[in-house]
Amino acid sequence: LDMGHMVNAIGQIDEFVNLGANSIETDVSFDSSANPEYTYHGIPCDCGRNCKKWENFNDFLKGLRSATTPGNSKYKEKLVLVVFDLKTGSLYDNQANDAGKKLAKNLLQHYWNNGNNGGRAYIVLSIPDLNHYPLIKGFTDTLKQEGHPELLDKLGYDFSGNDAIGDVAKAYKKAGVSGHVWQSDGITNCLLRGLTRVKEAVANRDSGNGYINKVYYWTVDKRATTRDALDAGVDGIMTNYPDVITDVLNEAAYKSKFRVATYEDNPWETFKK
């Protein structure tokens, strides 16, 4: 996946997909009652980016639905997966379940159109704090209660805090999750981070008995770092410049080993070499 980073305004969906992104990441902020409120990052954010673009969450969902519904005039066939970077740091731990419920209701109504020809993209819920694992159950229970368990097929999970791999595995156990796991690793583009933990995550993915299905690395804006990440065997790279990732994927060394994922690829299935 060529993952466009910090896509928080509806107009940016087109912008990033046109540069080659087949996936986007969107920030979700919550109000004090655990309602998803805005698609907003705020200051500080990545170097060289405007941190302040935003929409009301439900408006963004409607724009995203248009971009991922075949037949819609705004439809972008290439856009297959969306990561919601859930900014739950503003919430108390005991609000995590509620946040999941409210998030699910919003997506069900405004993105999935209550199961009636809604958006088709796969959705990854990315949670920054292992203690907020009840958000997952809040979300999945709500989809079941509302009569749409089939949408769980479209749903994946990520803990984005760069925690020890063993601790992340425990959090998933508590959450009752087995499968559909993307493991992120990374840091803002203003700083450097090695690939030690990425390689650990890739090893877990390829071990046959690990919890990880896919690994992505963020935020990569340079060709050299892109090559290093691909050499380490990642499944996705999050970037402010999707065209940089596209360029590297077109280099002779990578063209034969990697291709950009399409909707027909299963994002929950570990790729066997």
From Swiss-Prot:
One Pfam assignment: GDPD_2
GO CC list: extracellular region
Disulfide bonds: C45-C51, C47-C190
Domain of life: Eukaryota
Example GO molecular function: lyase activity
Binding site for Mg(2+): E25, D27, D85
Range of residues in the leader sequence: none
Keyword Metal-binding: yes
Protein purpose: Dermonecrotic toxins cleave the phosphodiester linkage between the phosphate and headgroup of certain phospholipids (sphingolipid and lysolipid substrates), forming an alcohol (often choline) and a cyclic phosphate. This toxin acts on sphingomyelin (SM). It may also act on ceramide phosphoethanolamine (CPE), lysophosphatidylcholine (LPC) and lysophosphatidylethanolamine (LPE), but not on lysophosphatidylserine (LPS), and lysophosphatidylglycerol (LPG). It acts by transphosphatidylation, releasing exclusively cyclic phosphate products as second products.
Protein's UniProt name: Dermonecrotic toxin LhSicTox-alphaIA1i
Organism: Loxosceles hirsuta
